[in-house]
Amino acid sequence: MRTKKQNFFLFLKIFAAIMVLILGGLYYFRDALLQQVIAKAETKFQTDYNCHFSVKKANFNGLSEVELHNILLVPQNADTLLAVQNIKTSYSFLELLTGDLQLNNLEMNNGFIQLVKNKNGRNFDAFLKRDNQEKSAEKRNYAKLAYRILSKVLNLVPSEMQLKNLALRTDDMGRKVVFQLNNLQLEDKKLQSDIIVKTAALTQNWKISGFADPRDKKADLKFSSNDTTKIQVPYIDERFGLKSSFDNIQVKLDKLEMESGELHIDGFTSIQNFTLNHPKVARKDVVIENARFNYRFLLGSDFISVDSTSSAQLNHIKVKPFAEYNTEEDTIYKLKVALPKMKAQDFITSLPKGLFTNFEGMEAEGTFDYQLDFEYNKNKPNKLVFDSKLNKENLRILKYGAANLAKLNGEFTYRAIENGVEQRPILVGAANPNFTPLDQISPFLEKAVLTNEDPSFFHHRGFINEAFKQSIVKNIRTKKFARGASTISMQLVKNVFLTREKTLSRKLEEILLVYILENNRIASKSRMLEVYFNVIEWGPNVYGIGEASQFYFQKSPSELSLSECLYLASIVPKPKKFMWQFDGEGNQKSYAVKNQKYIKNLMLRRALITDLDTIGQSVPIYISGKARSFLKLNTVVDSTVTDSISFDPDEFDF
């Protein structure tokens, strides 16, 4: 009778014999098995993607090296998607036995991938279709899913690689770009490549070099030009009119690991001398000399986040960001930004050139820090959190740039800009007979305009957090910038110091200039409002209340009635379209009357006016000045004509 030890060794012998038979069978039938795999792939491409896939010749060299010749992938009635003359690769047999395909070596020569979009469609559409299979009711685990995908991708990146004469060709309705990879070599964890990029307008020589270890999941790669020129990003200039270039980009991956059920991805990326040009961004080139992002991405079972230990740097400006998408209970978006204490002058000199032209040459002293806290619950949008806080210490402007905010306190010349063209000069000062001091303007006008435009003007510091919150909620709901949150301070800065161009640059400058104006007490609130009333547009080529009161009513600003002030306040958002408020008889249409009544009722509720002030105000306003010539009046009154314009409550957003 055999002992347990003898039985164990017998089992090992039998197991070894079976493994030898299996390996021998695999070795003997390896080419036949390879043909079956290729045939299965051909069938899948045909049935699932309506594509013809073929390999002219395929064979094994030994047990773990495969060689393929003349590989083609051609969608039906479309341009060839892929063609490669020769592929030779080896894989880890032991890893394959565990269910993971891990490539050790890869050689690929003479081929291309081609992405085409033309009037007949796209040659890659079949690969973008959605999977119609029912989704599992099981909650998705972001960490496990991401780690599984990234691990499989990195396993398919060989530890040794040589690619020669390969190309990526793109053709988007005639906009063609060719990325020609003459040679890419990965050996002893060192990557070196040369790429020629061709478009209709230019030819560039790029290179990628550095350290790459797909098995240890680490890399440190630098992307730059082979000569002294900057890399120009192709395609997007032709497609979107966005011109961009840079000296080099560096990407480093230090860590990609699962720890306690969370996926950690650590590293950094940086860019040097990044230049951007687009008419929606700024009038001139925007230049970022140095930018760096030290990242730590964390993925858990129900969240994806940029960890608070991450940091971003723009020249001398350092930021500590935190962002999170969380689905544990509700769908919640979080964003926190902390700008540690820094010198004000370092902040000014670090701003991207071309994006803040009015700040160029500005000098300041003192320090400040900043915190932003934002949280949005998709299921509870009205509970949005938006908290912005800036702390300053001995902050003082020593010298202004192009925008001299101090000029608000004295006499100056204002020129409105229409379609990029300066309009006639308006002198803001006593030498202008139309200039009207604040105490000589009807108090009804001040109260009506503030009620309609900025009720808390005398109390805020340029911005209204609650208005921003409402604006954000509405923009998210409508998925577009449907609502703004502009204060009188912002309107004043925009009118006096900036152009009317709708660019990112102009909006960012507006925000910063308003903050400086309001928080450094450069001009009093009363003076700001006085300038505002004397420069804003109140009709076609009508600027300031002095001109407006004569243009509409042939009165001085102090003589305006409550009804006339309500009318003037109501047309501030769209002054050039005032004539559409009136019918053919010169009377205000019902929607305009309703809007002005709404403003009046708000003023009553806020005790800005009394019931006595409204006595006699039911009489319709009469346009008696030059504005009457702009009205579409009937020469013969037709009593059958009805008002075709109905009240649109969304036309006036309070």
Predicted regions and their residues:
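Small-residue helix/turn framework positions
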Residues: 65, 70-72, 104-114, 124, ...
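Flexible beta-edge/linker motif
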Residues: 57-169, 189, 194-222, 237, ...
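Peptidoglycan glycan-strand catalytic modules in the bacterial/periplasmic cell-wall system
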Residues: 151, 155-156, 418-608
